[in-house]
């Protein structure tokens, strides 16, 4: 199957590129997967785009895939020929078993919430209730590439314009479906391998920083299990009233803050935002490269008597080293590697832009405490140049709201004040951020610098907005906590292993329980919730007709479609479910007003003018439909345009 060949060659290329990484076989596999996806995805996209838009060729993805496979094979062959040293596994059975079990679990969860099944002779794609809403734009984008040639790329829920959403991960999934993988395998495989690869590298970062493999395992465990007091509340209530059946069968996400009922802070985020795991995989490679540069802080010799005197001496030494020394502002001999890191982060911008922002913030924190700050500047400048190029290529500033940085204090706190933010963080994460402050005070200097760096995305989330919906800033806080977990894991291991005694072991158990119990309960909630799923008939007459008759240049007026047989055809909707396009920066209000007019007006001339002016080529009408609670009718539409498809209550009219 072409898709399997594509994946194998992609991995082989990435794996060979990682030869110089200071990790064992598992680390190389993980990094190789990420680099392979990044390179192969861009080659296919660029060649396919050029083939269709510039050369006007049909079947552009054929040329894109041939070019991608050929280039990746060439890179792999040249690297193998250049360096024939034998590969060392350098791993343990326990470590290998841990990674294998981890992969099986992640892959199972991906399929649990999104899979194809057969019911009553129909092939249905099932999406769990916790993810189907976010999957509406994801699957529509995937299908716009697998069933159509979405070049220049448009946003399917707001067609006829540009694309303001980082779509490249969906493009990769769409390309794999085009090459023969069923959509659930295409999306789930790259999602599972990307997230698994990130967690493998997170394990190695934690192991490298702390010196404990156990800290790596705990860090990965904490990734799945967030901190909050909410589950303790549920446990206390169950103990009080004895309703344990309700406790174990709960299907609603719990918490005390706005939108926690969305599953905004738990593993569900990675089940519905599949590209986030991939973005973090590339970010982890960048962080692994730079994090060693903070170790010098632990070698400072501080003189003086008394705590204050020693603190003053240490601050003066650090300040002189990071500001006044010659090495602080020079470029290192490994600046070329820093440039490659910049290329990777820049290439990531339209795979996951939020991860790029968070990573640059973290690297800025590293740079503050490091020598050779120009290396960081090289990485940042290349990243920003590539991001600027892509943003101007994909996004039309005249359409909707362009990306902008605005000051917005408080995030989702009830009171937009500093006390309100502190209260919000305690309600959201329990003891977590109190623990971060304590760890920053008591841990060694290099750890203090790392914590300072990893906390910067949290500060960004509470002060800056780049989109119309401030809630999307939750990703910055999630990213920060994922890396901050390393230091909690270190503290837990030290309490358990290095300080002998039952008391410290009890403290370790209590600490990890408080930090993970709500996240563990969230996993149960996901399991319970996604027993219920939204099913879409993949072979419906409507999907088939739309797939075969609608082109990517057509613009189709529908109801407020989220995930449906219409969106699974991969067509460009005039105004799909408005939240998706609105949160990406599109003017959904104007289009909604136009749609209400077209479906509800009795004025033929008004409808004709609107349809022509907006470039709408097809109108889909379903008996009994409403638009923003306004009644709709096709009484006038059928007088103006020919009905080209009818199936039950659904009719499609062609306007040109």
Task: Name what the model sees in each region.
Residues 93-95, 105-282, 532:
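Active-site lumenal/periplasmic loops and adjacent helix-entry segments of GT-C-fold
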Residues 285-295, 358-368, 427-448, 494:
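Hydrophobic, aromatic-rich transmembrane alpha-helices
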Residues 496-656:
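Extracytoplasmic
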């Amino acid at each position: 199957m072409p898709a399997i060949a594509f994946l194998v060659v992609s991995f082989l290329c990435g794996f060979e590129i990682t030869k110089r990484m200071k990790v064992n076989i598992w680390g190389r596999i993980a990094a190789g997967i990420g680099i392979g996806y990044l390179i192969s995805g861009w080659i296919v996209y660029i060649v396919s785009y050029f083939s269709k838009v510039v050369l006007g060729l049909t079947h552009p993805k054929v040329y894109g895939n041939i070019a991608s496979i050929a280039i990746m094979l060439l890179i792999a062959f040249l690297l193998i020929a250049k360096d024939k040293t034998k590969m060392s596994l350098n791993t343990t059975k326990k470590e290998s078993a841990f990674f294998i079990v981890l992969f099986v679990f992640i892959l199972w969860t991906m399929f649990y919430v999104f899979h194809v099944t057969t019911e009553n002779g129909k092939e249905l794609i099932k999406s769990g209730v916790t993810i189907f809403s976010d999957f509406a734009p994801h699957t529509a984008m995937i299908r716009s590439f697998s069933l159509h040639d979405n070049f220049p790329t448009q946003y399917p829920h707001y067609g006829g314009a540009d694309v303001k959403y980082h779509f490249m991960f969906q493009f990769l999934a769409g390309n794999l479906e085009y090459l023969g993988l069923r959509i659930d395998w295409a999306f789930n495989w790259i999602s599972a391998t990307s997230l698994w690869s990130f967690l493998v590298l997170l394990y190695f970062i934690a192991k490298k920083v702390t010196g404990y493999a156990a800290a790596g395992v705990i860090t990965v465990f904490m990734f799945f299990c967030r901190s909050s007091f909410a589950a303790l509340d549920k446990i206390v209530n169950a103990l009080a009233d004895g309703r344990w059946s309700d406790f174990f069968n709960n299907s609603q996400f719990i918490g005390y803050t706005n939108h926690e009922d969305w599953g905004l802070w738990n593993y569900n985020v990675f089940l519905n935002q599949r590209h986030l795991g991939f973005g973090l995989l590339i970010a982890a490679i960048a962080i692994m490269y730079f994090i060693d540069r903070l170790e010098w802080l632990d070698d400072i010799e501080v003189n003086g008597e008394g705590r204050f005197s020693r603190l003053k001496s240490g601050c003066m030494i650090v300040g002189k080293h990071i500001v006044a020394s010659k090495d602080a502002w020079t470029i290192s001999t490994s600046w070329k590697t820093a440039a490659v890191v910049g290329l990777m982060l820049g290439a990531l911008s339209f795979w996951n832009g939020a991860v790029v922002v968070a990573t640059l913030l973290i690297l800025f924190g590293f740079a503050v405490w490091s020598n050779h700050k120009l290396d960081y500047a090289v990485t940042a400048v290349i990243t920003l140049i590539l991001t600027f190029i892509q943003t101007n290529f994909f996004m039309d500033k005249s359409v909707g709201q362009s990306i902008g940085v605005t000051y917005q204090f408080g995030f989702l706190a009830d009171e937009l004040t500093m006390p309100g933010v502190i209260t919000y963080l305690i309600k959201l994460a329990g003891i977590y951020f109190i623990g971060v402050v304590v760890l920053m005070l008591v841990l060694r200097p290099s750890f203090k610098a790392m914590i300072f760096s990893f906390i910067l995305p949290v500060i960004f989330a509470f002060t800056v907005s780049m989109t119309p919906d401030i809630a999307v800033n939750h990703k910055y806080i999630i990213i920060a906590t994922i890396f901050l977990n390393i230091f909690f894991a270190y503290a837990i291991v030290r309490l358990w292993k290095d300080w002998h005694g039952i008391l410290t072991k009890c403290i370790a158990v209590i600490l990890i329980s408080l930090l993970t119990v709500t996240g563990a309960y969230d996993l149960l909630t996901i399991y319970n919730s996604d027993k219920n799923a939204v099913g879409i008939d993949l072979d419906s007459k409507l999907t088939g007709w739309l797939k075969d008759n609608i082109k990517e240049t057509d613009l189709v007026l529908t109801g407020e479609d989220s995930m449906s047989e219409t969106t699974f055809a991969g067509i460009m909707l005039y105004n799909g479910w408005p939240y998706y396009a609105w949160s990406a920066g599109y003017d959904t209000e104007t289009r909604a007003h136009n749609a209400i007019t077209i479906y509800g007006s009795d004025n033929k001339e008004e409808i004709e003018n609107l349809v022509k002016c907006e470039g709408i080529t097809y109108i889909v009408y379903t008996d009994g439909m409403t638009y923003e609670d306004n009644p709709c009718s096709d009484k006038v539409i059928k007088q103006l345009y020919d009905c080209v498809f009818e199936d039950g209550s659904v009719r499609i009219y062609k306007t040109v």
